[in-house]
């Protein structure tokens, strides 16, 4: 076949060379090169296949029969591509075809010249440049461009005279000088507008501001919170400190140090912490005011004074509880009792009640019912409140109360005083602790508990609540107006108003109806006036006065309108004012012709249009000015520029000043706490630690930073700084995020206080309180349990007898000599024991415990032996399963009418220990029927592309019902990448997250009911598998290998490889779906009269060989 194609290929090559050689080969600008092209040929090759035979062996499980393999070869055909070469002529680089010659090409057109070589122009006389387009370049001038220009700073040079044309910002003969500091621009003629010592750019006039200033002309100070060059530096001032706009130096409130971030150190206060505190006795000084916060027991401006008698504690705010003349300690409030008293507050008498004297042998002479106590030493009676006298048998005199009736009553306004408590019992109309306050307006009676019902300003009696009405009112609660025609107090006076005038119930003054006047409303309005009190003047032009009540003009004949000033009514014109005007936008209408006279800013026959953009005013005759920052042209009526928010000025070219924003800069910025205000909308850009529309709200708890976007990471109740997120720990915690307890031995705020616990006691890291170990007590656990007690908190009582001692921790009894036992309650005989020894009998180990432990050990050994036997059994069973056959379907490529060629799959998909079967003679045996449940497999794809299924136009529900099918391959089946996880035509091999291999493993397949007879080629027919869904009249082919499970030999489908593939010579077919979708077939599987001879149909069944155990031959592996 190869020899027959040689002359034909040579002839084709010669023709192609002749067609491509149209250029003149003698042209020196013609170049040639070789190009390659492909020709399809058909060639033969030796195709290996695996043949199976049986031998006798010692395999008991297979009845002493073993399967062996050998590799055989047969001749097969395949199509291939042969690469040919031919010479091709073309123009050399830089030339292009023009007829049969190659001419040079210039990328840029030669304006005044011609192209003589690639990208090379030959200019005409008098021109220069790469494209002959300019007389001289910018650096040369004069005849033949022979003189070099002397201009500097990008200045232009006159090509004729050589004079320099300076760029903006420069001047001088050669443009070597910059504009001075006050000018800029072309010829340095524009005046700089910079302020506050700013530098003006010599070209653009842009202002470079001095430190501390900003704005277009450096006219504004840096905004709050900024300072320095271009206001780019952020002020470090905290806690209300004010930053200098130039240096950034902080002016701090009193009590703050460097950058206002740290409070004054201990002992200092005031501005810049310059003053020294003067507090004594452990008082703490306020860092801002220097005011002393005194320690417990002291008071005064500098904490120099002890608490007054009767008070103690911090701020001397607590009252002493000491009684019976005891002295109170000003720091802790502890009581120092007088002789004869005891107790925490000295409230307990040493003598029993009713007794006194050094030996408590004398009886108190006091009245027991009225006496609080009897002095335990002197027997003096201390009377209860409300009683007095030597023996407490006299009541208090009027005006006195309390202990010994020494307190003076403070009751006023005739109130009674309670003899015991001194409480005032007020008379009706008064209240307060001393009855000095009269009942407030609206209340009356005892303790002012009753509410007055008086209305309309009536006065309520604080004693009985009776109402005194104001003028114009009457009734019990003064809620009724005076009857019509009456007025004054008690409604006793009569009104004198006429013509419907109203009478004021308070003063009787008349209020006249419109059109009347006078004290009694008995006079008409004068001519030319009308309305209430005749205060309004008639506004009539052509009228005979107006109505005295309404002011309506009485128009003369021939006039109309509200003021009688129009010939016709408003909006009408023509004969008898019978036509309506059609003018819009407040335009006036001519009464005789109806023509519209437009208002300023409008135009059109009916004034329906506003002025065109760019003009305004009367008849739209004025031109608008140039509005810089505006929504559009000027206002069509006024000609004013409508500035965008944030700008102002006649031309909208000025930014709103600091503190202003919005339309016409009419809004006032509300930003606080160093927030920056936008001149456009007034929105605030808040300083870190603040949020809100006006930056007035601090960050919510747990947030910090700009816009509070950061989340605090402080723990255990720590305070988080809203500015930088720094954690300030509560008592008992430390660390960057307050997650660490105080170190062992320390507690409290900042963990600076040392624990005082002893004897191994635990110290609370927050309060420092000691938790004692067993056997100890006391504030610092410094004391052992007292004799007779033991245990936690020393709350347990020892139970030892015979004067024995008890261990303060465990309560164990230490027996004295001669005693023994747990409680030392047994006589010890003659055995002398140490008084501190403690004996106990050892408990013998029971024999049943030893037996139980032995039985458990034996049981564990038996379980391990059974588990080992089970593992050995499973491994043996798996070894048997590896030799069972399975069936796999593989597509082939047609070569000719006698042979089929199996295409290769990627080597990575080869499975080890696979056994394959071939069908060299194709003996058809009895057809086998697959189990009925195989038809219900919900898949249309086989694993690893052993069988490709075309599902392109098949609905999912219909796929399950189709049984007969032929496999197809995509056109690019040779590309290994398409066989990874996709089936034919890109159909995914996975279904609901499972691969087909996993799904097939889980299906309950069973072995075929067919029997396989032992012969040289014992083939059996296998029915076409139900996974093929598209109907066809012809079939593919299959190849078989061993499965993974012995009990379902046809259940699992594995990948194949070129090394061990065995192909059945069955014709490839094209599915009905592929035929519809691929009319222009160019792939290796297209059918044509040459590929498919007559009578090439093969039935839809496949042959099966028995299994074998031999491995593939080395020849197959190398293949």
Swiss-Prot record:
Pfam families for the chain: EGF_laminin, EGF_PEAR1L, hEGF
Keyword Membrane appears in the UniProt entry: yes
Signal peptide bounds: 1-22
Disruption phenotype: Morpholino knockdown causes widespread disruption of myofibril organization and decreased muscle striation resulting in curled or bent tails, impaired swimming, and reduced motility in response to touch. Severely bent tails result from subtle abnormalities in somite boundaries and abundant gaps between myofibers.
GO biological process: apoptotic cell clearance; cell adhesion; muscle organ development; myofibril assembly; positive regulation of muscle tissue development
Entry keyword Transmembrane: yes
Name of the protein in question: Multiple epidermal growth factor-like domains protein 10
Organism: Danio rerio
Gene from which the chain derives: megf10
């Amino acid at each position: 076949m190869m020899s027959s194609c040689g002359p034909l290929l040579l002839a084709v090559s010669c023709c192609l060379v002749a067609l491509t050689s149209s250029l003149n080969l003698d042209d020196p600008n013609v170049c040639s090169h070789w190009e390659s092209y492909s020709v399809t040929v058909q060639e033969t090759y030796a195709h290996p296949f695996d043949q199976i035979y049986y031998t006798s062996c010692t395999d008991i499980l297979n009845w002493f029969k073993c399967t062996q393999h050998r590799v055989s070869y047969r001749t097969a055909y395949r199509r291939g591509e042969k690469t040919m070469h031919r010479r091709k002529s073309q123009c050399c680089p830089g030339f292009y075809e023009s007829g049969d010659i190659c001419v040079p090409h210039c990328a840029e057109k030669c304006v005044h010249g011609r192209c003589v070589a690639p990208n090379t122009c030959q200019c005409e006389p008098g021109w220069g440049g790469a494209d002959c387009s300019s007389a001289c370049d910018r650096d040369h001038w004069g005849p033949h461009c022979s003189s070099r220009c002397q201009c500097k700073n990008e200045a232009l040079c006159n090509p004729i005279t050589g004079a320099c044309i300076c760029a903006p910002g420069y001047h001088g003969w050669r443009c070597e000088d910059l504009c001075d500091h006050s000018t800029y621009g072309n010829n340095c003629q524009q005046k700089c507008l910079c302020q506050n010592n700013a530098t003006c750019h010599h070209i653009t006039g842009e202002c470079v501001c001095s430190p501390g200033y900003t704005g277009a002309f450096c006219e504004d100070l840096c905004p709050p919170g900024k300072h320095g060059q271009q206001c780019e530096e952020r002020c470090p001032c905290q806690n209300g400190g004010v930053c200098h706009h130039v240096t950034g130096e902080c002016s701090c409130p009193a009590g703050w140090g460097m950058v206002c971030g740290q409070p004054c150190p201990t002992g200092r206060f005031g501005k810049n912490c310059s003053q020294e505190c003067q507090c004594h006795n452990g008082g703490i000084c306020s860092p801002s005011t220097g005011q002393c916060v005194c320690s417990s027991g002291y008071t005064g401006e500098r904490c120099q004074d002890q608490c007054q008698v009767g008070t103690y504690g911090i701020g001397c705010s607590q009252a002493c509880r000491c009684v019976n003349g005891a002295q109170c300690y000003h720091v802790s409030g502890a009581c120092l009792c007088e002789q004869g008293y005891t107790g925490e507050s000295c409230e307990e008498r040493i003598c029993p009640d009713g007794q006194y004297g050094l030996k408590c042998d004398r009886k108190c002479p006091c009245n027991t019912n009225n006496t609080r106590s009897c002095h335990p030493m002197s027997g003096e009676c201390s009377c209860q409140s409300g009683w007095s006298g030597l023996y407490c048998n006299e009541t208090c005199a009027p005006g006195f109360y309390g202990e010994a009736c020494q307190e003076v009553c403070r009751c006023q306004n005739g109130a009674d005083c309670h003899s015991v408590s001194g409480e005032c019992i007020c008379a009706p109309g008064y209240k307060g602790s001393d009855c000095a306050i009269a009942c407030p307006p609206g209340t009356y009676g005892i303790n002012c508990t009753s509410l007055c019902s008086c209305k309309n300003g009536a006065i309520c009696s604080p004693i009985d609540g009776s109402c005194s009405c104001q003028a114009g009112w009457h009734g019990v609660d003064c809620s009724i107006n005076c009857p019509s025609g009456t007025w004054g107090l008690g409604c006793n006076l009569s009104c004198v108003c006429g013509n419907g005038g109203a009478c004021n119930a308070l003063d009787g003054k008349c209020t006249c109806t419109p059109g009347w006047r006078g004290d009694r409303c008995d006079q008409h309005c004068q001519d030319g006036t009308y309305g209430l009190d005749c205060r309004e003047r008639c506004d009539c032009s052509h009228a005979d006065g107006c109505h005295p009540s309404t002011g309506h003009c009485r128009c003369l004949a021939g006039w109309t309108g509200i003021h009688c000033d129009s010939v016709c009514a408003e909006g009408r014109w023509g004969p008898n004012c019978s036509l309506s005007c059609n003018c819009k936008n407040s335009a006036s209408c001519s009464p005789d012709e109806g023509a519209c006279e437009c208002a300023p800013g409008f135009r059109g026959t009916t004034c329906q249009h506003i002025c065109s953009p760019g003009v305004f005013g009367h008849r739209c005759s004025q031109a608008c000015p140039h509005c810089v920052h505006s929504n559009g042209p000027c206002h069509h009526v006024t000609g004013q520029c409508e500035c965008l928010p944030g700008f102002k000025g006649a031309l909208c070219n000025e930014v709103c000043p600091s503190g202003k924003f919005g339309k016409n800069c009419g809004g006032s910025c509300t930003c606080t706490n160093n927030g920056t205000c936008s001149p456009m909308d007034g929105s605030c850009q808040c300083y870190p630690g603040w949020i809100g529309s006006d930056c007035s709200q601090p960050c919510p708890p747990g947030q910090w930073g700009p816009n509070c976007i950061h989340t605090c990471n402080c723990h255990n109740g720590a305070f988080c700084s809203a500015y930088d997120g720094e954690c300030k720990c509560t008592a008992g915690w430390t660390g960057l995020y307050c997650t660490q307890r105080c170190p062992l031995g320390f507690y409290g705020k900042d963990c600076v206080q040392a624990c005082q616990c002893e004897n191994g006691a635990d110290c609370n890291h927050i309060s420092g309180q000691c938790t004692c170990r067993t056997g100890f007590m006391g504030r610092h656990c410094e004391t052992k349990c007292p004799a007779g007690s033991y245990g936690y908190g020393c709350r347990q009582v020892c139970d030892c007898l015979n004067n024995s001692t008890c261990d303060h921790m465990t309560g164990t009894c230490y027996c004295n000599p001669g005693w023994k036992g747990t409680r030392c309650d047994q006589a010890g005989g003659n055995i002398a024991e140490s008084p501190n020894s403690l004996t106990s009998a050892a408990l013998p180990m029971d024999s049943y415990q030893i037996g139980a432990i032995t039985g458990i050990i034996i049981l564990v050994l038996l379980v391990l032996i059974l588990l080992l036997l089970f593992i050995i059994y499973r491994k043996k069973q798996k070894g048997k399963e590896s030799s069972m056959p399975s069936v796999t379907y593989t597509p082939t490529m047609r070569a000719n009418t006698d042979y089929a060629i199996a295409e290769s799959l990627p080597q990575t998909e080869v499975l080890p220990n696979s056994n394959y079967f071939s069908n060299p003679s194709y003996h058809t045996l009895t057809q086998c029927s697959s189990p009925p449940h195989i038809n219900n497999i919900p898949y249309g794809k086989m694993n690893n592309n052993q069988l490709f299924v075309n599902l392109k136009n098949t609905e999912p529900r219909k796929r399950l019902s189709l049984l007969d099918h032929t496999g197809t391959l995509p056109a690019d089946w040779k590309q290994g990448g398409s066989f990874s996880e996709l089936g034919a035509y890109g159909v995914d091999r996975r279904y609901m997250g499972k691969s087909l291999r996993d799904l097939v493993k889980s299906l309950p397949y069973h072995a075929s009911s067919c029997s396989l007879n032992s012969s040289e080629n014992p083939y059996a027919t296998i029915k076409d598998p139900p996974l093929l869904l598209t109907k066809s009249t012809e079939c593919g082919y299959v190849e078989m290998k061993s499965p993974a499970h012995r009990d379902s030999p046809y259940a699992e489908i594995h990948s194949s490889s070129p090394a061990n593939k065995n192909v059945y010579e069955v014709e490839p077919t094209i599915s009905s779906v592929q035929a519809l979708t691929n009319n222009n077939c160019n792939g290796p599987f297209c059918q044509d009269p040459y590929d498919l001879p007559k009578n090439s149909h093969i039935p839809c069944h496949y042959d099966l060989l028995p299994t074998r155990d031999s491995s593939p031959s080395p020849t197959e592996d190398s293949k």
